[in-house]
Amino acid sequence: MPDAWDKFGKTVEVSGEGMVLTKTSGGNYSRHAAAKELLSSGVHSWEVELTSGATQNNNRDMFIGVAAPGCDVEKGDHHDKGKAWYLRTHDGNVYGGDIDCEDAAKKGKFFLVGDRVGLRLDCNDGSLRFYKNGEPFGEQFPPGTISMPVVRAVELKCNGQSVTLFPEVQLA
């Protein structure tokens, strides 16, 4: 069976045979969720589709990437603690690994409902590349940035936000 969302807190629900993750309650605070498969060697590619924005205002501000196993699912911002490496859909920047990107213009316009964030993790060199709808996108985490092992991870912020995991996708 392919990987699925496995670790999540009380404000999040999983459906669709473990592939759909939705923040259903709580305030507008990031909450971590992770998939089950431990990624420690080889090259892995997958996509996360933005299934829905926030119920109140369609906000799609979320983090998508990888994290060290065991991060607290009732908290967020694990990239600030050196435990996660994410693309933030709100500004298109990467967060984690001491990478400091310039503040982006047009916040909130980078990813819309239905868009897919592709990820290609090379565990052998510790790099992570991002894609938008199958095309290379934005900054990357260069070789040596990411410490293995990791798990697929997201942080959802607002009630109603939902993502769908597609764990086996080919990305160049």
Where are the model-predicted features located?
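PRY/SPRY (B30.2) beta-sandwich protein-interaction domains
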Residues: 1-172
